[in-house]
Amino acid sequence: MRNLIVRRLQGARNDRGAIGVVVAILMGAGVLFGMGALVVDVGQLYQNQAELQNGADAAALAIAKSCAEGSCTPSIATSYADANASGLTGGTAYVTFVCGVNGAGTVGTGACGTGNKHCAANPPTGTNYVEVETSTELANGSHLLPPVFARTLAGNGNYQGSTVYACSQAEWGAPVVGNTVGITLGYCDWTEATSNGTTYASAPPYPPNPASLPVVIDFHDPTGQETDSNCPSGPAGQTASGNFGWTADPNSNCTLTGSDFTYTGGVYTYGGNTGNNTPSDCQTVLGNAQTNQTVIYVPVYAAYNGQGSKATYTLQGLAAFALTGYNFGKQFQVADRITGQLPCGGNGKDVTCISGYFLQGLIPASGASLGGTNLGVQVIKLTG
């Protein structure tokens, strides 16, 4: 057994000797050095490409946001590209070009061409989009990322470096579906409250313009005494098709996600709820929104079929709403935070309502899809 152990130890020592010989041969031939040079220099290229991509993404989203908000300033691309560059290039990056389409106009150098191999294909005609391409730039103005070791290898004496490129594409526009709260407002009331999309109030915490004091949107008014809408009559138990109703609550959290809207016959639809009692989860959502002055996003319907839990709403678009008060009976009511009055009176009448005002803004991209009617809300998404 002792001889066996000795032989095994001797074998291990012999293996180490063999490995040492192989390493010496490879080093003598420059193979290991070449491999190390390749790893270091390729790693630099990957790092530069990642930084350029981050800069292009950030710039595309920032420009898209500025365009959605009305200013459309492509010149901000450079600051975002530089902010994502590291010491590898001296904290700088080059914006090769900015192009795109904004409604009837263009962004940057104009509509993007179709032959840029670094960028995604152009979106369909009629889409608002911007493309930002970034590339290597050093603090000294050079556009070549110099190698660390590669130039020392045989045959590479003239190699000066490489230029790395990255491209990003962002789109913006009205969302067709998205994540919303579990209430729905009518297109008629949206049209009246915003003068057909021409007048919006300031977003909280700023008070709205005096001309845009909170509107009261009735949900249930069997006496007709509180109705001040010019919208046509609607489902049983509701004042008008232009007013407010509960949606179905498939997630039991007073929310609808993009997947809760059904696309049929060229339109999106979603289910309704009787609303005989205010759902407890909606009491929490609406209470928090009113207390914290949080903007809520609501589906706006253009038409409906059926009644109560069998009602189906046809989606017109998504809107942003600042909830300032509500009255669903003595168990769930709060005075409007601007007027100080309980909306839709009370005084024993069987009337329920919400109060607030419509806003312009950006809806979170999660769960949202582009292509809807513009009701003051837009979404921005990276698409390439």
Question: Which residues are covered by each model-predicted region?
Answer:
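N-linked glycosylation sequons
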Residues: 71-78, 82, 91-384
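Alpha-helical assembly-interface signal, strongest on the long, hydrophobic N-terminal helix that forms
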Residues: 1-82
